[in-house]
Swiss-Prot record:
<dbReference type="InterPro" id="IPR039008">
    <property type="entry name" value="IF_rod_dom"/>
</dbReference>
<dbReference type="GO" id="GO:0030855">
    <property type="term" value="P:epithelial cell differentiation"/>
</dbReference>
<protein>
    <recommendedName>
        <fullName>Keratin, type I cuticular Ha4</fullName>
    </recommendedName>
</protein>
<feature type="region of interest" description="Linker 12">
    <location>
        <begin position="204"/>
        <end position="219"/>
    </location>
</feature>
<feature type="region of interest" description="Coil 1A">
    <location>
        <begin position="57"/>
        <end position="91"/>
    </location>
</feature>
<dbReference type="InterPro" id="IPR002957">
    <property type="entry name" value="Keratin_I"/>
</dbReference>
<keyword id="KW-0175">Coiled coil</keyword>
<dbReference type="GO" id="GO:0005856">
    <property type="term" value="C:cytoskeleton"/>
</dbReference>
<feature type="region of interest" description="Head">
    <location>
        <begin position="1"/>
        <end position="56"/>
    </location>
</feature>
<dbReference type="GO" id="GO:0005829">
    <property type="term" value="C:cytosol"/>
</dbReference>
<dbReference type="GO" id="GO:0005882">
    <property type="term" value="C:intermediate filament"/>
</dbReference>
<feature type="domain" description="IF rod">
    <location>
        <begin position="56"/>
        <end position="367"/>
    </location>
</feature>
<comment type="similarity">
    <text>Belongs to the intermediate filament family.</text>
</comment>
<keyword id="KW-0403">Intermediate filament</keyword>
<feature type="region of interest" description="Tail">
    <location>
        <begin position="364"/>
        <end position="394"/>
    </location>
</feature>
<feature type="region of interest" description="Linker 1">
    <location>
        <begin position="92"/>
        <end position="102"/>
    </location>
</feature>
<feature type="region of interest" description="Coil 2">
    <location>
        <begin position="220"/>
        <end position="363"/>
    </location>
</feature>
C-alpha cells in the first residue's frame, strides 16, 4: 500500500482578509495513520508574530517527528516492494526459457511412453485372450479325450459282459448237448435192451413152438413182435417228445432271460452313457466357469492395480495441491496481517491528521479578522491583499 504526502508551502496566505497568517507547523497534511497524542495538547493561542507557547510547540514537534518517521517507513516499504517485484520478474524471466522446452520434451516423452504402454497393454490383452482360447481348446480336447476314453472303457466292459454271457450260453449249450447225447445214449441203450429182450423172447418162443408144434395151434410171432415194437416205439416217441418239449421250454426260457437281460443291459448302458455325457458336459462347463473366474480375477487384479496407481497419483496430486493451498493460505494470512498493520497505521495517521485539523481550526477561530501587523527581521509587514507579503509567516 503506497501513501502520498502533499506538504504545503511555507509562504504567506494570498488573502489576509479571509485567513490570517499561520505558522508552517500548523498546516494540515493528507496522510493515513494514527498516533498516540500526548495529553498536554491544548488550543493554540495565536499571536501576530505567528509563535506558540511551549507545550503547543512540543506537541506539534512530536507529531511532526512521528509523521516523518511514518513517511520514512512507508517509503522504505515501497522501495522494498519495488525491489522484490523486480527480483521476482527477473527470476521468472530467467526461469521461463529454461522450463518451457524441458516441459515440452517431457510431455512428448510422456505421450510416447503412454502410447507404448497402451500398445503393450493391447498386445498383452491379445496374448491373454489367445492363451485363454488355447487353454479352452486344450480343455475341450482333454474333455473329449476323457469322454472317448470313458466310452472305450464302457464298450470294453460291455464286450466283457457280453463275452461272459456268451460263455454262459456256450456252457448252457454244451450242457444241453451233453444232456441230448445222454438221452440219445439212453435211447440207444433202450433200443439195445429192447432188441435183446425181443431176441430172447424170440428164442424162447421158437423153442416152445418147436416143442408144441404138434400139440397147439401156431401163434403169429411177427404180430406179437410188431405190437411190442409199436409199444416200445410209442414209448420212445413219448419220451423223445417230452425231452424235446423240455429242451424247447428251457431254451425259450433261457432266450427270454437273455433277451430281457440284454435289454436291461442296453438300457443300463444307455443310461450310463447318458450320465457320463452329462458328467463330462458338466465338467467341461465347470472348467469353463473356472477359467472364466480366473480370467475375471486376473482382470480384477489388473484393474485394482491400475486404479490403485491412478489413486496414488491423484492422492499425490491432491497432496501437492493441498500443500500449495496451505502455502497460499499462509501468504494470504501474512498479507492480511500486513494489510491489517497498514490499516492500523493508516487509522493512527488519520487520527493524527484529524488532531492537526482540529488544532488548526481551533486556532483559526481564535485569530482576529484583521490581518496581523507584525514586522519581520527585514522590516516588511503582512498587510491586506495587494500589499507586499515577502516576510509574512516565515
Amino acid at each position: 500500500m503506497s501513501y502520498s504526502c502533499c506538504l504545503p508551502s511555507l509562504g504567506c496566505r494570498t488573502s489576509c482578509s479571509s485567513r490570517p497568517c499561520v505558522p508552517p507547523s500548523c498546516h494540515g497534511y493528507t496522510l493515513p495513520g494514527a498516533c498516540n497524542i500526548p495529553a498536554n495538547v491544548s488550543n493554540c493561542n495565536w499571536f501576530c508574530e505567528g509563535s506558540f507557547n511551549g507545550s503547543e510547540k512540543e506537541t506539534m514537534q512530536f507529531l511532526n517527528d512521528r509523521l516523518a518517521s511514518y513517511l520514512e517507513k512507508v517509503r522504505q516499504l515501497e522501495r522494498d516492494n519495488a525491489e522484490l517485484e523486480k527480483l521476482i520478474q527477473e527470476r521468472s524471466q530467467q526461469q521461463e526459457p529454461l522450463l518451457c522446452p524441458s516441459y515440452q520434451s517431457y510431455f512428448k516423452t510422456i505421450e510416447e511412453l503412454q502410447q507404448k504402454i497402451l500398445c503393450a497393454k493391447a498386445e498383452n490383452a491379445r496374448l491373454v485372450v489367445n492363451i485363454d482360447n488355447a487353454k479352452l481348446a486344450s480343455d475341450d480336447f482333454r474333455s473329449k479325450y476323457q469322454t472317448e476314453q470313458s466310452l472305450r472303457l464302457l464298450v470294453e466292459s460291455d464286450i466283457n459282459s457280453i463275452r461272459r454271457i456268451l460263455d454262459e450260453l456256450t456252457l448252457c449249450k454244451s450242457d444241453l448237448e451233453s444232456q441230448v447225447e445222454s438221452l440219445r445214449e439212453e435211447l440207444i441203450c433202450l433200443k439195445k435192451n429192447h432188441e435183446e429182450e425181443v431176441n430172447t423172447l424170440r428164442s424162447q418162443l421158437g423153442d416152445r413152438l418147436n416143442v408144441e408144434v404138434d400139440t397147439a395151434p401156431t401163434v403169429d410171432l411177427n404180430q406179437v413182435l410188431n405190437e411190442t415194437r409199436s409199444q416200445y416205439e410209442a414209448l420212445v416217441e413219448i419220451n423223445r417228445r417230452e425231452v424235446e418239449q423240455w429242451f424247447a421250454t428251457q431254451t425259450e426260457e433261457l432266450n427270454k432271460q437273455v433277451v430281457s437281460s440284454s435289454e436291461q443291459l442296453q438300457s443300463c448302458q444307455a443310461e450310463i452313457i447318458e450320465l457320463r455325457r452329462t458328467v463330462n458336459a458338466l465338467e467341461i462347463e465347470l472348467q469353463a466357469q473356472h477359467n472364466l473366474r480366473d480370467s475375471l480375477e486376473n482382470t480384477l487384479t489388473e484393474s485394482e492395480a491400475h486404479y490403485s496407481s491412478q489413486l496414488s497419483q491423484v492422492q499425490s496430486l491432491i497432496t501437492n495441491v493441498e500443500s500449495q493451498l496451505a502455502e497460499i493460505r499462509c501468504d494470504l494470512e501474512r498479507q492480511n496481517q500486513e494489510y491489517q498493520v497498514l490499516l492500523d497505521v493508516r487509522a493512527r495517521l488519520e487520527c493524527e491528521i484529524n488532531t492537526y485539523r482540529s488544532l488548526l481550526e481551533s486556532e483559526d477561530c481564535k485569530l482576529p479578522c484583521n490581518p496581523c501587523a507584525t514586522t519581520n527581521a527585514s522590516g516588511n509587514s503582512c498587510g491586506p491583499c495587494g500589499t507586499s507579503q515577502k516576510g509574512c509567516c516565515n
